[in-house]
Amino acid sequence: MEWNDAPQLDPRAVQATSVSAQDENASSQEPQALKITAASSNPKMFTLPWELPLSQWPADLFVNLPRGISRHVVRFVHVGDEVYAMKEITRQVAEREYELLRRLRKLELPTVTPIAVVAGRHDANGEKLEAMLVTKHLKFSLPYRALFARTLRPDTAERLIDALAVLMVRLHLSGFYWGDVSLSNVLFLRDADAFSAFLVDAETGDLHGSLTEGQREYDIDLARTNIIGELMDLSSGQLLPTEVDEISIGNRLVDRYHSLWSTLTDVDKFSPDEMWRIERRVNRLNELGFDVDELEMKTSEDGRRVLVRPRVCLLYTSPSPRDGLLS
């Protein structure tokens, strides 16, 4: 690669490094020089004004896209031909969220794509600046507030909740404990008359082999509380149709989640001459966007009943909330 024709670099980039995310020492201590941790190198990243707080970057770098509510400074930035979302947070949180998003992507779960962690940032006076988590902008996606700012059908809130229920079940089946479920931490893509939901903020999350019922129920209860609050906020800003009942929408998430979870995990019981019901159950799961990895089959003690529990894996394409159960 020829660097002679590269744009002017930040002076600190001379000492900077771009390392693999698998570097065991990557998070051991605060870097003294600019350090970009990424799965693959992108020299254009070094040309950005890392010596400035994100809010003070030149306006011509920014892309005017709808942003959700965040407790951090977040901007969309042109990096070559790509558009990246930049979020200023502490180095430890940035590195943890980056690795977690990478693991979720490897599981083919619907999340934004992590690009890099940028640490070792200092201003012109040598004062430390917060690190940045860089993710790829999800094309055509919108945060929930941007959707409600448009003229939409009165049942938009219900369709968003249905999409969020599917996302939560997918994440929970893979052992992901969210810890901060809300509409603000999700991006939505239109899917004909429905929506697909994507995880955008994994700051408080954690990945386990499996989740306990208590962990799942905590996520569900928190989601209900947050959603009701977010919808009430929209209502106070006159962005929510008057016929929408915020509490009913929050309760809808709980009902949809439990219905889908039951469909995916319950044990079927039937007599040996009703084996056709296995195929119907498998087809039903396929329609919802889940593939059956294997079937666990047992007979009852008296031998009169067959017990079947499917073990599912996730198809890459997101199931539409309008399909079957969530119609």
Give the location of each predicted region.
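Juxta-kinase regulatory segment immediately upstream of eukaryotic protein kinase catalytic domains
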Residues: 2-57
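Conserved kinase catalytic-core helix
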Residues: 150-179
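ATP-binding glycine-rich phosphate-binding loop
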Residues: 48-79
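Active-site activation/catalytic loop segments of kinase-like enzymes and analogous catalytic loops
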Residues: 184, 216-243
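Catalytic activation segment of kinase domains across protein kinase-like and atypical kinase folds
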Residues: 184-222
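Conserved structural core of kinase catalytic domains
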Residues: 121-158
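Single conserved hydrophobic/aromatic residue that forms the stacking wall/gate
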Residues: 316-326
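ATP-binding glycine-rich loop module of kinase domains
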Residues: 73-98
